[in-house]
C-alpha cells in the first residue's frame, strides 16, 4: 500500500499532488504538495523527497530526506518502520523532523506544530490501515 506513492492522497487527503520524478540507485525522488493547517494558519508545503526502502527479515523501513533546494522546507527527514506484529497485523513506528523555510507566526509555538504533525501521522496511519483492508476504498 505505502510503496505506491500514487496512493498517498488516498492515504491522507492533505496530500494533494504526488509525482515520481526520478528513480535511481539512491532511491526515488518524489514531489509532493501537502495542504497543512496549524492552528488558524494554513500553508501548502511543496517538497521533493528522496525515498529509500530498506527491507530485511524483520522490518520494512521507508526513509525520506527532503531536498531543500527543491522544497519550501529548509530541512526534513521521515522514517516509517513497519514490523510484523503477528495475526496478520503490522505495527508502524513513524518519526519525522522538519524545519520550514518560511515564516511562522510566534503565536504558533512548537507545541502547536507537534500537535498538528501528530494529528497528520494518525490520519496517515488510519489511511494505510483503511487502504490495506479495502484497496478499492477512497
Where are these regions (language model features)?
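Residues that form generic nucleotide/phosphate-binding pockets
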Residues: 1, 115, 131
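Hydrophobic pocket/interface hotspot
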Residues: 1-2, 8, 51, 92-94, ...
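Hydrophobic ligand-binding cavity/cleft-lining segments
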Residues: 1-26
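Glycine-rich portal/gate segments that line the openings of hydrophobic small-molecule binding cavities
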Residues: 19-71, 123-137
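Beta-strand/loop substructures that line and gate deep hydrophobic ligand-binding cavities in soluble
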Residues: 46-47, 65-119
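Generic helix-packing signal
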Residues: 2, 82, 100, 125-128
